[in-house]
UniProtKB/Swiss-Prot annotation:
GO molecular function list: protein-lysine-acetyltransferase activity
Protein name as it appears in the record: Peptidyl-lysine N-acetyltransferase YjaB
The UniProt record lists the keyword Magnesium: no
Organism the protein comes from: Escherichia coli (strain K12)
Function: N-epsilon-lysine acetyltransferase that catalyzes acetylation of a large number of proteins. Binds acetyl-CoA.
Superkingdom of this protein's organism: Bacteria
Top class in the EC scheme: transferase
Pfam family, one: Acetyltransf_10
């Protein structure tokens, strides 16, 4: 699969929300159903307008996306149908080309993501007992140190 990175388009907002939903459903089974719904509502409210970087396949179909704020990657979500095909790595490499001191946070219970980040060169630099909304889902703070 050939992956390209481009900016998101407003008209593909629903498609990106669908990727978020499939990705979260595949990796975040630790979330309560109520909180999962709350997060989806929040994502639906801001994702179509967010300045995302989108990974697309040869047909220009989105297969993943990330949100980068300065040196911090706020979000990275990959369609589970293409997990293991290098989409996440390509997005991280793109982020590093713009933000060489890249940091991110990941849910501690999301073992797949924790393993991915360590594999591509991140190390744990801290831990929070709660997520960004103050809910009891611990976050690991990560910084890129090189693969």
């Amino acid at each position: 699969m050939v992956i390209s990175i481009r900016r998101s388009r407003h008209e593909e907002g629903e498609e990106l929300v669908a990727i978020w939903c499939r990705s979260v459903d595949a990796t975040h089974d630790f979330l309560s159903a109520e909180y999962r719904t709350e997060l989806e509502d929040l994502v639906r409210s801001f994702l179509p307008e967010a300045p995302l970087w989108v990974a697309v396949n040869e047909r220009d179909q989105p297969v993943g996306f990330m949100l980068l704020s300065g040196q911090h990657m706020d979000a990275l979500f990959i369609d589970p149908d293409v997990r293991g095909c290098g989409v996440g790595r390509v997005l991280v490499e793109h982020a590093l080309s713009m933000a060489p001191e890249l940091t991110t946070n990941v849910n501690e219970q999301n073992e797949q993501a924790v393993g991915f980040y360590k594999k591509v060169g991140f190390k744990v630099t801290g831990r929070s007992e709660v997520d960004d909304l103050g809910k009891p889902y611990p976050l690991l703070n990560l910084a890129y140190v090189g693969a």
